[in-house]
């Protein structure tokens, strides 16, 4: 039988004051450089937050294809436990530029909301990042919290 030890490591991505991530715009700003690494693939990220919504870190959960990525609640919340985060914001990009949620995006958000309740971790928002020029509203992102779906 093999027994493994779980751990978490940190790589400095930004030096300065603790960034409070409490709006969709700040979420997009915090993850901008992360999404730039793979602009033609969907990437799903979780931002780990303390009790004052200060970022403890960010973790890429999944890197997919041009049009989808696989996400499971277990993988989303594992880093939150390891970092002792009290809340999370999840986000993914739409390489097409249109941030409108798909049926799969809505379903995943519902699953994450239910898992968060059970695990007693606050799911603050799920933000889909696109491009302002492809967004009918012109903002370039979609927030499940702002639209009342979370």
Per-range role (PLM):
Residues 1-12, 17, 50-52, 62, ...:
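Active-site-proximal loop/helix of nucleotide/amide-processing enzymes and allied scaffolds
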Residues 22:
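Extended substrate/RNA-proximal surfaces in nucleic-acid metabolism proteins
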């Amino acid at each position: 039988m093999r027994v493994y030890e779980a751990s978490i490591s940190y790589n400095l991505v930004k030096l300065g004051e603790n960034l409070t991530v409490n709006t969709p715009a700040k979420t997009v700003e915090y993850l901008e450089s992360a999404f730039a690494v793979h602009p033609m693939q969907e990437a799903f990220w979780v931002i780990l937050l303390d009790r004052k919504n200060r970022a403890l870190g960010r973790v890429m959960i999944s890197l997919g294809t041009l049009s989808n990525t696989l996400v499971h609640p277990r993988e989303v919340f594992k880093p939150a436990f390891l970092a002792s985060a009290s809340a999370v914001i999840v986000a993914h990009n739409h390489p097409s530029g249109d941030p409108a949620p798909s049926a799969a995006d809505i379903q995943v958000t519902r699953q994450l909301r239910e898992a968060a309740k059970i695990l007693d971790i606050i799911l603050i928002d799920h933000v889909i990042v696109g491009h302002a020029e492809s967004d009918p509203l012109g903002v370039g992102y979609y927030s499940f919290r702002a639209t009342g779906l979370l």
